[in-house]
């Protein structure tokens, strides 16, 4: 479970780094926060979780 904070930190870094470069995605975020948020904006999160072994349980 020690790697979970690292994964969260990396995700925050990626989000902060990608936000300025992805204007269209940032504009769509307010509309997605209700239900589409988990489907639209978190596939990379699941990928990193699986890659690190923190979420998938592999």
Curated annotation (Swiss-Prot):
Give the UniProt tissue specificity note.
Expressed by the venom duct.
Return the InterPro entries for the record. Answer: T-conotoxin
Record PTM: Contains 2 disulfide bonds that can be either 'C1-C3, C2-C4' or 'C1-C4, C2-C3', since these disulfide connectivities have been observed for conotoxins with cysteine framework V (for examples, see AC P0DQQ7 and AC P81755).
Subcellular location(s) per record: Secreted
Please name the GO terms that the record assigns under molecular function. toxin activity
A cellular-component GO term for this protein:
extracellular region
Record keywords: Disulfide bond, Neurotoxin, Secreted, Signal, Toxin
Mention any Pfam family matching this sequence: Chi-conotoxin
Q: Does the keyword Secreted apply?
A: yes
Domain observations? The cysteine framework is V (CC-CC).
Q: What is this protein called?
A: Conotoxin Im5.4
| Organism, scientific name | Conus imperialis
């Amino acid at each position: 479970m020690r790697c979970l904070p690292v994964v969260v930190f990396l995700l925050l870094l990626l989000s902060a780094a990608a936000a300025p470069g992805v204007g269209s995605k940032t504009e769509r975020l307010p509309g997605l926060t209700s239900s589409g948020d988990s489907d639209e904006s978190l596939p990379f999160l699941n990928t990193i979780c699986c890659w690190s072994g923190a979420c998938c349980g592999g």
